[in-house]
């Protein structure tokens, strides 16, 4: 018995899907109490919660190094909020497992005229995570892959989530192609 939380700009637009061009300020979250969420889940007998950390619109619910399309550009806690961090702490406090839903589709990152994600760059050897000046990782593990620009971005976001938010019990990949 698990909880699945789909929470993002669509919470405020009342649309089923976003298009990746929503103004992040539309995410007008005033209060967040993940302890209340987890206490209610625990009382209901749930053992795990999966959070949609990023849906197809590309809006992220954590302080990612790799995009500005997320809570860092919203008014939530003056752009300093981190829903993943708060939920992870609450899950640990209440003994719940935490899973993440991370969409490989990202409508905010469409750059090619064919409507594909990214810029159709060539596959080259890349190190994951991609370094970002001033934002080092505590975890010094790196991986090398043959990737294009978009997949370097996606894999670096996945690395953030798997190394900075405590135990992650499940990763749910889902996707949709714009064509």
Regions found by a protein language model. Name each.
Residues 1-179:
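Mature catalytic domains of secreted/periplasmic carbohydrate-active enzymes
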């Amino acid at each position: 018995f698990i909880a699945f939380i789909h929470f993002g700009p669509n919470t405020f637009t009342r649309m089923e899907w976003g298009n990746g061009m929503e103004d992040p300020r539309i995410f007008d979250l005033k209060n967040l109490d993940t302890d209340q969420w987890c206490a209610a889940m625990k009382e209901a007998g749930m053992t795990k919660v999966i959070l949609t950390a990023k849906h197809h619109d590309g809006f992220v619910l954590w302080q990612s190094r790799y995009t500005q399309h997320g809570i860092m550009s919203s008014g939530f806690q003056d752009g300093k909020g981190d829903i993943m961090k708060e939920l992870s702490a609450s899950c640990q406090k209440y003994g719940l497992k935490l899973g993440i839903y991370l969409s490989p589709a990202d409508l905010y990152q469409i750059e090619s005229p064919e409507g594909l994600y990214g810029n159709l760059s060539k596959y080259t050897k890349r190190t994951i995570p991609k370094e970002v000046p001033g934002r080092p990782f505590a975890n010094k593990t790196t991986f090398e892959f043959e990737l294009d620009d978009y997949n370097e971005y996606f894999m670096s976001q996945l690395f953030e989530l798997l190394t900075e938010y405590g135990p992650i019990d499940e990763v749910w990949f889902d996707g949709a192609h714009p064509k």
